[in-house]
A protein has these predicted regions:
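A short, well-ordered alpha-helix in the C-terminal region of glycosyltransferases
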Residues: 351-365, 369
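A conserved mid-protein helix/loop that constitutes part of the nucleotide-sugar donor-binding site
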Residues: 19, 207-230, 240, 247-253
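Short hydrophobic beta-strand element within catalytic cores of glycosyltransferases
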Residues: 309-313
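Nucleotide-activated donor-binding/catalytic signature segment of Leloir-type glycosyltransferases, i.e.
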Residues: 253-271
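N-terminal subdomain of nucleotide-sugar transferases
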Residues: 1-45, 368, 402, 406-433, ...
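Short alpha-helical donor nucleotide-sugar binding micro-motif in glycosyltransferases
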Residues: 148, 270, 278-284
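Aromatic "clamp/platform" in nucleotide-sugar-dependent glycosyltransferases that forms part
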Residues: 292
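Conserved acidic donor-binding segment of nucleotide-sugar-dependent glycosyltransferases
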Residues: 324-325, 329-335, 344-349
Length: 482
């Protein structure tokens, strides 16, 4: 099968969804014999060759200061759409409701193939973080839900993710398709554990608690640190290891210093080597993941792969499938609840090991198994699409452009309202940036010119909307040349 995978993040940006796309592409190419192409926004000076599948990096705009670390892709990129179309995929799987799904719908219009969409994360939280609360957030969410509703098969990574999608206004059907992990089942070698943890103060017999992920407050890091202070106040021995980086790392390190618990807390910084991450999961006695933001909690299953049980928040998505004191631990969302559990758990490390073994046996799922299940669903979708039993979604070029492109691009990048101070910082790269923005403008012309004869009755204000967007882009280009 010829498969097109689309996502708004890909190396050099490594996040949970980028990891999903890479595993899908690798396993389908190497293990299942499929032909795969990946479309993603381009980052400057990045080599996209060397993968066992083709990566089409299309033009993007630098919004890294506005949307921490991420660029905003141009879903109307002529060269990007053209190359993906030339690949002639039989199915398109998009993993982000923003630029990727706009591009998927453009491709579908040309190729007449089904679109699968996976809802990975709570985008209302991401949008609010990028643009704040208010009208822009509301309109961006509305556009994204419209985008998702236009897809032929909607997947969510957990039951809780589906409930969150419903809360945003999505009314269609969806199915739960779980992600896997690329950790081999089982603990890593003692030698690798010793090598990886060398130089860190980890006394034998003292419980080691572990967190792996972005050091962001919404991940529940403050709750962990508050709980650790309670343990220290009671003179309970422990070591806490935070693996990862993030925008809130300095603030959290300062919080640890203010509490006077620095001797017990280790911040390793980001670790990208998978074998070293396995080693930390093997060395630890308990994984702490008090996040109510994450919809799947892949790190919880990575810990389980190494026989490490997790502490999770009651009713969170990450806690789905967890039975308290059987294959994990469930607490209320407050530091006192976590501190009480850690105090009790520290008394019997052998019991923690048994719960970790149960987690390995009961909640572990490999990426190979997960992708094979997804691939089987592709076959079902394609068959229904071709024999007419899968209802076709109505496509509207004007809706696609105005309700999706302009709102989503504005919502995630605020391209047209970029402040002059930010423009000044980009001035040295403006020649390249100007060409990319002009490509967005040219894409608007292409869509306008491609409106079919059957749309003659579209109201004049729709065309006025197109003209207004073009004028804003022209104004932006002119300001950058001043």
């Amino acid at each position: 099968m010829r498969v097109c995978l689309l996502n708004d993040s890909f190396p050099p940006i490594i996040d949970g969804v980028a990891n999903v796309v890479m595993n899908y592409a690798r396993i389908m190419t190497e293990n299942l014999g499929d032909q795969v192409i990946v479309g993603t926004p381009r980052y400057p000076d990045v080599d996209y060759t060397g993968y066992p599948y083709e990566v089409v990096a299309y033009s993007s705009v630098d919004t890294t200061d506005l949307v921490k670390g991420y660029r905003t892709g141009n879903p109307l990129s002529v060269s990007g759409v053209s190359r993906l179309s030339d690949f002639k995929p039989e199915i398109i799987h998009t993993h982000c409701p923003a630029s990727s799904t706009i591009m998927a719908r453009v491709l579908q219009k040309e190729l007449d193939v089904p679109i699968v969409f996976t809802y990975h994360t709570k985008f209302d939280v991401d949008i609010a973080r990028a643009v704040g609360e208010g009208f822009l957030k509301k309109e961006t969410i509305k556009a994204m839900v419209s985008n998702i509703s236009a897809c032929d098969d909607v997947w969510v990574v957990s039951k809780g993710a589906g409930e969150n999608l419903r809360s945003l206004g999505y009314e269609g059907e969806y199915r739960v398709v779980s992600n896997g992990v690329d950790f081999q089942k089982g603990k890593t070698s003692d030698a690798l554990v010793k090598e990886t943890t060398a130089g860190f103060d980890l006394p034998e017999g003292v419980p080691v608690f572990l967190f792996v992920g972005r050091i962001m407050k919404y991940k529940g890091i403050p709750l962990i640190i508050d709980a650790l202070k309670e343990l220290s106040d009671k003179d309970i021995k422990y070591r806490m290891v935070f693996v990862g980086g993030g925008a809130d790392a300095e603030e959290m390190q300062e919080k640890v210093r203010e509490y006077g618990i620095s001797d017990n807390v280790i911040f390793t910084g980001p670790i990208h080597e998978r074998d070293k991450l396995r080693a930390w999961n093997t060395r630890a006695d308990l994984f702490l993941f008090p996040s109510v933001y994450d919809t799947n909690g892949i790190v919880v299953r990575e810990a389980a792969a190494c026989g490490l049980a997790s502490v999770l928040i009651k009713d969170s998505c990450a806690a789905e499938g967890i039975t308290h004191d059987r294959n994990g631990f469930i607490i209320e969302e407050d530091p006192h609840s976590m501190a009480a559990l850690l105090e009790e758990a520290s008394k019997d490390l052998s019991h923690l090991a048994q719960v970790g073994q149960n987690a390995m046996d009961e909640i572990y799922i490999s990426w190979d198994e997960s992708v094979r299940d997804a691939r089987n669903r592709y076959d079902e979708i394609l068959k229904m699409f071709r024999d007419g039993t899968l209802p076709r979604k109505k496509w509207s070029g004007t809706e696609l452009l105005l309700d999706s492109a302009s709102k989503i691009i504005s919502g995630t990048g605020e391209i047209f309202n970029t402040s002059r101070s930010i423009q000044e910082g980009m001035r040295e790269n403006f020649a390249e940036f100007k060409d990319e923005v002009r490509e967005v403008r040219d894409g608007l012309y292409d869509v306008r010119d491609g409106i079919h004869d059957g749309l003659h009755d579209v109201k004049s204000e729709i065309r006025d909307g197109l003209q207004e967007i073009r004028e804003k882009i022209d104004e932006f280009i002119d300001r950058g040349q001043e």
